[in-house]
């Protein structure tokens, strides 16, 4: 499969090799729809999370049966679409650190050979859902995340932790603590997730996190970017999701800063505007609306990135 470039940090030279990708099940549940969206955008890679293969129920790429996985691989290869990152459910916001660790290790064991077969360099992991009143990371979380990290690294694969509804995402301080305790772990920064997550490093009542502050403290560890934008809605006590650059996620500022620092890895879209992956109450969205939203989101991000890169090249004379 395709060899993927590594992100660069601190290099002012602007490169043209940035990869645009997206979390496939935000475009369609079925593998055919995910491939269709990728090809319509003239992209070459998917970030695969949930997928439905004909004849099998939808599941995460590391959980679907071997026969379903084989079929998915054949369809991807036939279409010339690579998998940039595995959007795994390993230790995610639906799991507690009190759950049996054997189940987590079984997911890791299934994911590794599938990543290798697809040539995926990155696997997104998390660090379990904290209790409502927790503000410290338990030692057992560090132990489990380190073991999972080591298993992927030993296989030549790079785990990346996402700031989300997990212990490592409780604040940028918690994130740095997790990275310190788990050598070799890297970060995937989600621009919108700080908007709806409380900053548990501060006294109660916990304020919501600041996306820019989180980015500035974590950017040296970031090798992958999830592009999502949102605005906090006090009336709903939840986030409303927006086009990139139109919310409070500081998407334009983060992207401008990333480009200035030489970031040339992937920008992966996760619109959330039609359906929210972790919203158990969300109804099945109209397939056409889901697809059209994904395509327009991707085109808007490409336009933003091109404008920022052009302005930066003009300013630096490169």
Per-region residue spans from a language model:
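A structural motif
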Residues: 43, 48, 81, 115, ...
């Amino acid at each position: 499969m395709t060899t993927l470039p590594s992100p660069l940090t601190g290099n002012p030279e602007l490169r043209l090799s940035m990869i645009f990708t997206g979390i496939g099940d935000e475009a369609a549940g079925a593998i055919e729809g995910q491939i269709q969206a990728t090809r319509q955008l003239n992209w070459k890679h998917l970030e695969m999370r949930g997928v439905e293969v004909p004849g099998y129920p939808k599941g995460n790429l590391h959980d679907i049966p071997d026969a379903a996985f084989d079929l998915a691989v054949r369809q991807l290869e036939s279409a010339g679409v690579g998998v940039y990152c595995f959007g795994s459910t390993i230790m995610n916001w639906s799991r507690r650190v009190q759950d049996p660790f054997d189940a987590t290790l079984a997911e890791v064991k299934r994911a590794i050979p599938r990543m290798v077969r697809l040539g995926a360099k990155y696997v997104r992991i998390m660090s379990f859902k904290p209790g409502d009143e927790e503000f410290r990371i338990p030692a057992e979380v560090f132990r489990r995340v380190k073991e999972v990290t080591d298993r992927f690294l030993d296989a030549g694969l790079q785990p990346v932790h996402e700031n989300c509804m997990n212990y490592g995402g409780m604040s940028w301080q918690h994130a740095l603590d997790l990275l310190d305790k788990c050598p070799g772990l890297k970060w995937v920064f989600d621009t919108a997730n700080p908007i709806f997550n409380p900053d548990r490093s501060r006294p109660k009542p916990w304020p919501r996190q600041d996306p820019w502050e989180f980015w500035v403290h974590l950017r040296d560890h970031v090798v992958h970017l999830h592009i999502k934008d949102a605005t906090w809605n006090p009336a709903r006590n939840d986030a409303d999701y927006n086009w990139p650059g139109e919310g409070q996620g500081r998407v334009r500022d983060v992207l401008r800063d990333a480009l200035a620092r030489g970031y040339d890895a992937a920008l992966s879209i996760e619109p959330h505007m039609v359906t929210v992956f972790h919203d158990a109450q969300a109804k099945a969205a109209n397939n056409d609306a889901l697809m059209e939203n994904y395509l327009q989101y991707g085109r808007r991000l490409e336009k933003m990135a091109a404008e920022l890169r052009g302005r930066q090249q003009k300013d630096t004379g490169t």
